[in-house]
Amino acid sequence: MTNLRKTHPLMKIINSSFIDLPTPSNISSWWNFGSLLGVCLIVQIVTGLFLAMHYTSDTMTAFSSVTHICRDVNYGWLIRYLHANGASMFFICLFLHVGRGLYYGSYMFLETWNIGVLLLFAVMATAFMGYVLPWGQMSFWGATVITNLLSAIPYIGADLVEWIWGGFSVDKATLTRFFAFHFILPFIIAALAGVHLLFLHETGSNNPSGLSSDADKIPFHPYYTIKDILGMLLLILVLTSLVLFSPDLLGDPDNYTPVNPLNTPPHIKPEWYFLFAYAILRSIPNKLGGVLALVLSILVLAVIPFLHTSKQRSMMFRPFSQCLFWILVADLLTLTWIGGQPVEHPFIIIGQLASILYFLLILVLMPITSLFENNLMKW
């Protein structure tokens, strides 16, 4: 009798995706972040569901409903902080996952990469709308500032902003629709992640060398299931440590102040994971230019496969490209730092230089360096 997992219509899909999947034998821990992102998504959906049972999306009661969750609901504080810090872990895993793709040339799987870029946009949209829901000062002013950016779009901008707000300012209608979208988007993200995996399994995984691994494949289970479980345990350890010891480390104290539309916080800034894009937005004095730069800072990822000029796929054997990659990482860390600083000298000029360097590295320096390395190898 043939094994049930190989014949049952549903088990067959699971088997070919997680058990008998032929996997390169040399993939490193950098390949763990896909499964960790899956864990993060499940944690966010489960904790979010329990939060939604007690949350009210009304401007009068939203803030107090979050307070009620933390004070009166059994382990409500734990669920709330798991959800808030789970978002931070989600973005840490996302950035490392994208960084791995850039370093090892995984972007050559075009469909997988493009779905990944779409996923990144969807997760960023979800996180932004989630940040508005507690209805603290930073929630309100963050929503006002970011939605207002759409008014930079010529001709339809002003109408578009009022359409999103559902009125003439960020108010009850805005909060209600943001809650609705924040609830539905994670399920869309889960579906997109399924498509992401579908495209990945069409080609098979890349590996650190960037070479074909068809001659040396091993089954996913037990080798990589146990490796993924170790990664998950480490992720849960870091998340629970953060939640139980310093849950507000990555948050903004301004969000513990209820909304006051008449009082603007001294420094309006988003959560830490958006600071790099926020710094790029602020580095351009023109409103429309800033919005375009903001969108392009993420959208530039979709262009990277077409700028791949090297004869090798991975950066493993390309020391000059490696140098530029780590300069890019340092540049992104600099932008993250600048995004959290006030708009004054010397932060303005540092932000502008870091923004120029970001686009220069990706669009110009990396492709030219790859051509130079090809010549070094006499190709």
From Swiss-Prot:
Cofactor or coenzyme needed:
heme b
Looking up CDD domains in the UniProt record yields: cytochrome_b_C, Cytochrome_b_N
**TM annotation in the entry:** 33-53, 77-98, 113-133, 178-198, 226-246, 288-308, 320-340, 347-367
The entry marks the following residues as binding heme b b566, namely 97, 196
Topology in the lipid bilayer is annotated as: Multi-pass membrane protein
Example GO biological process: mitochondrial electron transport, ubiquinol to cytochrome c
Matching entries from Pfam families are given as:
Cytochrom_B_C (PF00032), Cytochrome_B (PF00033)
What keywords would UniProt list here? Electron transport, Heme, Iron, Membrane, Metal-binding, Mitochondrion, Mitochondrion inner membrane, Respiratory chain, Transmembrane, Transmembrane helix, Transport, Ubiquinone
Q: Which domain of life is it from?
A: Eukaryota
Q: Entry's InterPro entries?
A: Cyt_b/b6_C, Cyt_b/b6_C_sf, Cyt_b/b6_N, Cytb/b6-like_sf, Cytochrome_b, Cytochrome_b_C_euk/bac, Cytochrome_b_N_euk/bac, Di-haem_cyt_TM
Binding-site list for heme b b562: 83, 182
Classification via PROSITE patterns: CYTB_CTER, CYTB_NTER
From the Swiss-Prot or TrEMBL record, state where the protein is found: Mitochondrion inner membrane
Q: Name one GO cellular component term.
A: respiratory chain complex III
Return one GO MF term: ubiquinol-cytochrome-c reductase activity
Which residues hold a ubiquinone? Answer: 201
Can you quote the record's cofactor note?
Binds 2 heme b groups non-covalently.
What miscellaneous comment appears in this entry?
Answer: Heme 1 (or BL or b562) is low-potential and absorbs at about 562 nm, and heme 2 (or BH or b566) is high-potential and absorbs at about 566 nm.
Q: Quote the function comment for this protein.
A: Component of the ubiquinol-cytochrome c reductase complex (complex III or cytochrome b-c1 complex) that is part of the mitochondrial respiratory chain. The b-c1 complex mediates electron transfer from ubiquinol to cytochrome c. Contributes to the generation of a proton gradient across the mitochondrial membrane that is then used for ATP synthesis.
Subunit structure of this entry?
The cytochrome bc1 complex contains 11 subunits: 3 respiratory subunits (MT-CYB, CYC1 and UQCRFS1), 2 core proteins (UQCRC1 and UQCRC2) and 6 low-molecular weight proteins (UQCRH/QCR6, UQCRB/QCR7, UQCRQ/QCR8, UQCR10/QCR9, UQCR11/QCR10 and a cleavage product of UQCRFS1). This cytochrome bc1 complex then forms a dimer.
Member of which family? Answer: Belongs to the cytochrome b family.
Protein's name in the database = Cytochrome b
Q: Which organism is it from?
A: Sorex fumeus
Q: What is the lineage of its organism?
A: Eukaryota, Metazoa, Chordata, Craniata, Vertebrata
Gene that codes for this? Answer: MT-CYB
